[in-house]
């Protein structure tokens, strides 16, 4: 449903087609918030039809790009779904569109990339994408384009924990830094070592992994049912607020350092 206070893109002026990867790289490195290129199998340019011709006689302007690459890791796909190989799945690694083309331009353009895949890469049966909640990305664009959501934080076999010395709502030290600073993730060890640093308490919280979104690209209803049944983990309603998925922190008291007696 369209909202009165929003501007929407004229979808008749938007088109998608594959572009040179060098052009896509330049756009991503220049404009994407990461300013970093990534793995790329298909670079799909997002074009907008203009009312005037440019100096080369073109009536379309490149306003964005969607970059899809093969997932990294031997078991990247098989850990998610049975029956598909790594060459049948792509990951949306970058998406950038210039501002000023309507509030729904991202969702419309992303949906058009699904159509492009079905037509030009029919061997691709599943798309993946990840959002980082601690970067403020909960995946609103994926909700708008009907991706399936899996809470990877419930799938972790060996979760990592961050430590706060500033209270429950303070800054949490990353697990890698915790190990580097205190030599272990063992809770009893941390109680001792953090106590030696003069702290009487600390808070520990499970670190969140990136949220996983899945788009199935079946050729028919039967294949869709088969692919859905082959997913190894349940799909859930995607979160709308980080508080919906933020792990609870736990408070611990440290051990007081033993009095050291010097013998002379």
What are these regions (language model features)?
Residues 226-264:
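Short, cationic low-complexity segments
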Residues 18, 69-201, 215:
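Acyl-donor binding region in acyl/amide transferases
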Residues 149-153, 221-226:
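Substrate-binding/catalytic groove segments of enzymes
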Residues 13, 210, 217, 242-243, ...:
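A positional "C-terminalness" feature that preferentially activates on distal terminal regions of long
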Residues 28, 41-68:
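Conserved beta-hairpin
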Residues 1-40:
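Short amphipathic alpha-helix that is part of the acyltransferase structural core
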Residues 41-43, 208-213:
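Short hydrophobic/aromatic beta-strand or adjacent loop that forms the aromatic wall/cage
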Residues 183-184, 204-206, 216, 223-231:
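Hydrophobic helices that insert into or interface with lipid environments
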């Amino acid at each position: 449903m369209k909202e009165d206070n929003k501007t929407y893109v004229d979808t008749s002026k938007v088109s998608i087609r594959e572009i040179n990867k060098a052009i896509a790289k330049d756009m991503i490195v220049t404009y994407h918030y990461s300013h970093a290129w990534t793995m790329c199998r298909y670079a799909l340019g997002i074009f907008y039809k203009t009312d005037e011709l440019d100096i080369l006689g073109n009536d379309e302007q490149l306003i964005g790009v969607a970059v899809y690459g093969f997932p990294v890791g031997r078991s990247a796909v098989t850990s998610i779904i049975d029956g598909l190989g790594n060459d049948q799945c792509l990951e949306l690694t970058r998406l950038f569109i210039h501002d000023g083309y309507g509030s729904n331009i991202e969702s419309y353009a992303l949906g058009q990339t699904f159509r492009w895949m079905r037509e030009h890469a029919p061997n691709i049966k599943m798309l993946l994408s990840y959002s980082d909640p601690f970067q403020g990305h909960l995946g609103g664009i994926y909700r708008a384009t009907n991706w399936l959501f899996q809470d990877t934080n419930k799938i972790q076999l060996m979760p990592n924990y961050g430590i706060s010395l500033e209270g429950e709502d303070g800054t949490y030290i990353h697990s890698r830094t915790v190990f580097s600073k205190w030599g272990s993730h063992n809770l009893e060890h941390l109680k001792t070592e953090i106590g030696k640093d003069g702290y009487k308490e600390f808070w520990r919280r499970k670190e969140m992994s990136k949220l996983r979104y899945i788009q199935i690209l079946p050729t028919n209803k039967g294949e869709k049912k088969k692919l859905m049944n082959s997913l190894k983990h349940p799909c859930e309603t995607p979160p709308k607020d980080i508080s919906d998925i933020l792990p609870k922190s736990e408070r611990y008291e440290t051990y007081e350092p033993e009095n050291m007696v010097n013998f002379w």
